[in-house]
Amino acid sequence: VGKKNLEKALEIAKPREGAKDVVFTTTWRPFFLMPPQVWTRGIASGQFPEDAETEGIEKLAYYISKFGANSLPPMLERLGGAMRDSGIEGFSMGGNTGPTLDGHRLATYAEREGLDKQNAFMEEIFRAYFCEEKAPCDRGVLLAAAKNAGLDEAKAREVLDAPTAELGELDEQMQRFARGVSGVPFFIVSDGKKRFKLSGAQPAEAFLEVFEDLGIDE
């Protein structure tokens, strides 16, 4: 939802007189809602099945255990409504959730291949998870997302085959960008001099206000 609202704001802002010479770029930075060690400990303690790292766990059951059977339905109703308002169809809580380390590693690799490809990769991952009931830890899902985003499938496979690939860059970015962040989506909008931070799935109007504060106005 946050991604779609940002894109809507960019579509509105780019034709403006004050934005004609402005180059907008979007870069995705890492953040773990459930860090890899949480999955490792959960498997070791028996909280999660032994194959959770590769197969995931049932998404709906997990969120019920986290938020409660009474609290979850209205939360999902609000999320589904926000998705529809943003033009996203097919929202579903079916399928599995799971570790996202491999997806983060591929997103880090994708950044070097071009920000457009990284953004396309994230779009594929979000669609697979929220609309197609596919697990974020499924190797086939990740490779398909990479291919559909225009990334070299063989190179993406090499990243997945090497457990430590991209971990150094990933850790460095976590240290630089994730400190002080408690949830996602979280946006940093900057012109290189001034920075504005927005937390949550902000409406397009919120981004437009920031653009105006940066001098990108009508």
Sequence positions of predicted segments:
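Structural alpha/beta surface segment adjacent to cysteine/selenocysteine redox centers
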Residues: 3-129
